[in-house]
Swiss-Prot record:
This is Thyrotropin-releasing hormone receptor. It is found in: Cell membrane. Gene3D superfamilies: Rhodopsin 7-helix transmembrane proteins (1.20.1070.10). It is a multi-pass membrane protein. It comes from Gallus gallus (Chicken).
Length: 395
């Protein structure tokens, strides 16, 4: 994806450099950075998909959107990062005409799907927190799956436009021939498409996210007590007291405060994802806009590398954010690793009675770090008899 070349040399792909002018130092730095970032990102995003699909309590609408985002990021890392490595090694396009079409298509599909996935979970968070009654029938897992299918279907059809713009460009020099995946039309034809992408998949999602997270912050941080009558604390206390007067009466305030803290934490985590998306995509998007108005586009190799690294970081960093800011994701990642390490060991049979006290809030459909409080008495006894379990054996 580059708008940084002139009509006489129309390269495509994620900001591929002018290979005939790169130095050995540039090649080494490119290969090492791309391998490191893309490798970690691929592993991290695969883990996100696995923990959500294999852990029952992680299958929430918000996590459904995060799986969509992880798949899109995987597509970007594989379709954009790996071709950059081969071009740095061979200084030429090695995947042929079909590879040129398919790889470029997958790059744009991943980028556009990730942008819409972020927009989808932003809207879902807004409804869940600012309109908790509506969230009970709008923020459901089945509806989230339908929205994701629509997002990917729309992005798939939209990105087919690139099939009609791409071709292999061959440059013949005295001692070598360089093949590149580029455009078969002049820059005046494909620049408007870049500008349309800029508006639909960057400006619009970021403006919408800014407005919605502002409204969320006003409700969640300035007035944390939910306005939904079903969540009235006094009613909740009375109902819980009738069910378990001895244990639950001591946990009412703590559990309710824990729910509020959980809602804040998940909102902070998703807001960080959006902010990083905005800042890490800004160098590339800015370059595209600026080059659209320059007669001789700016294409300094080191700056192009910087733009690429920012894009790869955006696709690779989300699993790190989940691990740092979500206790449930952190525990699920740990269980996934332990499950593979202990796969050959047969777990001991056990039978332990646990008393669960679930806090039901109107946005429980969408909170991936929603707390399930276990009484201290049973928890202490459970710790002595329950070992590590794999993700598929969640209570």
């Amino acid at each position: 994806m580059e708008n940084g070349t002139g009509d006489e040399q129309n390269h495509t792909g994620l900001l591929l450099s002018s290979q005939e002018f790169v130095t050995a130092e540039y090649q080494v730095v490119t290969i090492l950075l791309v391998l490191l970032i893309c490798g970690l990102g691929i592993v991290g995003n695969i883990m996100v998909v696995l923990v959500v699909l294999r852990t029952k309590h992680m299958r929430t609408p918000t996590n459904c959107y995060l799986v969509s985002l992880a798949v899109a990021d995987l597509m970007v890392l594989v379709a954009a990062g790996l071709p950059n490595i081969t071009e740095s090694l061979y200084k030429s396009w090695v995947y042929g005409y079909v590879g040129c079409l398919c790889i470029t298509y997958l790059q744009y599909l991943g980028i556009n799907a990730s942008s819409f996935s972020i927009t989808a979970f932003t809207i879902e968070r807004y409804i869940a927190i600012c309109h908790p009654i509506k969230a009970q029938f709008l923020c459901t897992f089945s509806r989230a799956k339908k929205i994701i299918i629509f997002v990917w279907s729309f992005a798939s059809v939209y990105c087919m436009l690139w099939f009609f713009l791409l071709d292999l460009n061959i440059a013949v020099y005295k001692d070598t021939t360089v093949v590149s995946c580029g455009y078969k039309v002049s820059r005046s034809y494909y620049s408007p498409i870049y500008m349309m992408d800029f508006g639909i998949f960057y400006v619009l999602p970021m403006v919408l996210a800014t407005v919605l997270y502002g409204l969320i912050a006003r409700i969640l941080f300035l007035n944390p007590i939910p306005s939904d009558p079903k969540e009235n604390s006094n009613t909740w206390k009375n109902d819980m007291a009738q069910q378990n007067k001895t244990v639950n009466s001591k946990m009412t305030n703590k559990s309710f405060n824990s729910t509020i803290a959980s809602r804040r934490q998940v909102t902070k985590m998703l807001a960080v994802v959006v902010v990083l998306f905005a800042f890490l995509w800004m160098p590339y998007r800015t370059l595209v806009v600026v080059n659209s108005f320059l007669s001789s586009p700016f294409q300094e190799n080191w700056f192009l590398l910087f733009c690429r690294i920012c894009i790869y970081l955006n696709s690779a960093i989300n699993p790190v954010i989940y691990n740092l800011m979500s206790q449930k994701f952190r525990a699920a990642f740990r269980k996934l690793c332990n499950c593979h390490l202990k796969r050959d060991k047969k777990p001991a049979n056990y039978s332990v009675a646990l008393n669960y006290n679930v806090i039901k809030e109107s946005d429980h459909f969408s909170s991936e770090i929603e707390d399930i409080t276990v009484t201290n008495t049973y928890l202490s006894s459970a710790k002595t008899s329950i070992g590590d379990t794999c993700l598929s054996s969640e209570a």
